[in-house]
Structures are given as structure tokens and as C-alpha cells.
Amino acid sequence: MAILSDKWIREAAQTRGMIEPFEEAQRRDGCISYGLSSFGYDARVAPEFKIFTNVNSAVVDPKDFDGDSLVDRETEVCIIPPNSFALARTVEYFRIPEDVLVICLGKSTYARCGIIVNVTPLEPGWEGHVTLEFSNTTPLPAKIYANEGACQFLFLQGNERPEVTYADRAGKYMGQRGVTLPRL
């Protein structure tokens, strides 16, 4: 597998709609950076958040997820309580080529503040908004800034198309829009 450069990412975004909307240059004036980088793309977090709460004394069960465990917020600044968690999504909609796997890494600006971003790989043939998981590992409230950088995606090209892509198997998160909760 080879990591793909800014030139390849730009061409795929502009001619195949791989990333929409697409920021052709890295933006970083007075904000957490986002846009095209040398070997990746820094995506933005949309102003749509689901913050975990314990007001209903629910148990988090990935096989039977209860949406009542979350509070919906549309805001430019999301405050995650201490040692808590929030779901969000990217501003960008991704369409992953059939011979590419995408890995996501957190932004160092957030990591240095104890805020961890987790995203599973974007599989060949998948498309949708990416649901982002933010963990506040600190004993203090933490801010997430909407419409600014949240994570970096690295694009890896395989030596051939896999036998079965995410689209071929009709994966359960195919075409997701908005913040998407766990599905079984």
C-alpha cells in the first residue's frame, strides 16, 4: 500500500467528488487547521453534536443503543463535560474509491489538550459523512470548535480492488448523513 499525496487527493476530490466540500489549501489563520495537506486531508467538524449524559441512568450497550443517553446540540462551540464523550460529524462528505483505504488520526492541537478523536477506517467503496467520536480525557470541561479542523485522513492505495468493497456488501453505514448512532 502506498500513501497518496496532495496531488492525488486534489485530483480525486475535483474530478470524482471524493471530498465535498473540498478545501484545496490548508487553512490555519486563527483556527484549528483544516484542508489539504502534503499527504492527507484535515476535515472539519460540523456544528451538530450529540453529548453523552447520565440524566436517565442508562447503560451504554452497543447492541441495543439508547439515544436517550445523548443530548443534541447545534452550536459553534461544543463543551464536553469532564471525562465524557460526544459524537459529531465531518462537514465534508466522502466517497472512497474502490482501491483506497482511509485511516484517520486526531489533531495534535486537541490531543495536547486531552481531547482524543476516534474514527474507524473508511473502507473501499464507502461514502457518507464521517461520524467523529470525541473523548474528553481531562477532569475539566473541554471545547470543540465547529467548522474547524478535527482530524486528518490519510489515503492508502492498495495494489488492486478488493474482492468485496463496503458498497458491494451494502455496509450498514453506507451513505450516512448527519451524526449516525450505532447500528446492529
From Swiss-Prot:
Domain of life according to the entry: Bacteria
Entry-linked Pfam families: DCD (PF22769)
Catalytic residues of the enzyme: 133
Pathway: Pyrimidine metabolism; dUMP biosynthesis; dUMP from dCTP (dUTP route): step 1/2
Name of the top EC class for this enzyme: hydrolase
Enzyme Commission no: 3.5.4.13
GO molecular function: dCTP deaminase activity; nucleotide binding
Record-listed dCTP binding positions: 107-112, 131-133, 152, 166, 176
Catalytic activity: dCTP + H2O + H(+) = dUTP + NH4(+)
GO biological process terms on file: dUMP biosynthetic process; dUTP biosynthetic process
SUPFAM superfamilies linked: dUTPase-like
Record keywords, A-Z: Hydrolase, Nucleotide metabolism, Nucleotide-binding
Subunit structure of this chain's protein: Homotrimer.
Family to which this protein belongs: Belongs to the dCTP deaminase family.
PANTHER family: DCTP DEAMINASE
Main function: Catalyzes the deamination of dCTP to dUTP.
UniProt-recorded name of the protein: dCTP deaminase
Gene: dcd
